Amino acid sequence: AVDALQVAESLDLVAEECSPFQDIANNPAKELALVLAEATPLVWGGSVLAARASRRVAEQLRAASGRAALAADASELCTVVAEVPRRDLFADPFVDPTSTARPAVIVLDDGDETDEVGHDLRMLENTARDHEVRVWRTTHARGSVMERYVGLLHTGRFGAAYLRIALGHDLD
């Protein structure tokens, strides 16, 4: 059975962590918005509920930025990341701006330490590193499965709201 009080307390903690009054160094939602300011989000969650949260977060990021966002299994994201062209160290973004933003892998970690999730995470992180794609992770590993789910979901939703503000869009 889900303990509604515990879930509500988890939501309160996320609201405190992601408060506009929190410095960016201590605010995972603001950090997420900065990571995605000029990036295309590729969102991954390893467990069933983290994967569900990743789809919801991707929807929020897509709505906030007007850009494509993808939530998928690690193997599918690795295929996308493997096709990312290498960075040109000598490219001048002001002279030759690229038409598409580089991707950033967003990992929603609910503390699931099964072998399959660990393998998928390592595969995704290694592929991203090999192709110079940034990886950003948020973790909510304490509490019940539902508490971890809402922690990941709402950190992503706060991040999407900050991204929307940073990009100059109204919060309608």
Predicted regions mapped to residue ranges:
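A SIS-like phosphosugar-recognition module
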Residues: 1-16, 20-172
